[in-house]
Amino acid sequence: MPCKTKKELFMSNSHNKQAFINILCEKLNEYDIRYKNAVDDADLLIAQTAVDCALSSEVIVIGEDTDLLVLLIHHVNQQCRWVIFKSDKMAINKKMKIWNIQQTKGFHGEDICHLLPFLHSLTGCDSTSRLFGIGKGIALKRLNQEYLKAQGQLFMNTT
């Protein structure tokens, strides 16, 4: 019987979400399809799995949040083949956003990409609130300043 509830409402209930995941895993297992089930937040597992797969083939990751994009940019390395991130959300009257992770890393440089998790947590992510009045664009421009870079290095070395 089809579920007539909106996806967001259904998945907002943790019991429903876990039951759906369990059923999906059972079905995938029936067809010998490999899967990974994240215990906590799935973003890091998705990014690490994409990097592992990208060592032998091109990878397309479809996701809905900036956390995943930041983790991909941070973790993809030179040994990886092409990694593409496609947003599954389309803004009204706008095109779907698609990022080539290697080109994005090339544009921003390794130093900035290494510090992106620091910048992202400072400006708001799934697990932290953003500081009032500091957007991601402004913070990214300021990341070239030595003081902010030093704070970012300290943050990244202690996590």
Task: Please name every model-derived segment.
Residues 1-159:
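Noncatalytic, typically N-terminal accessory segments of nucleic acid-processing enzymes
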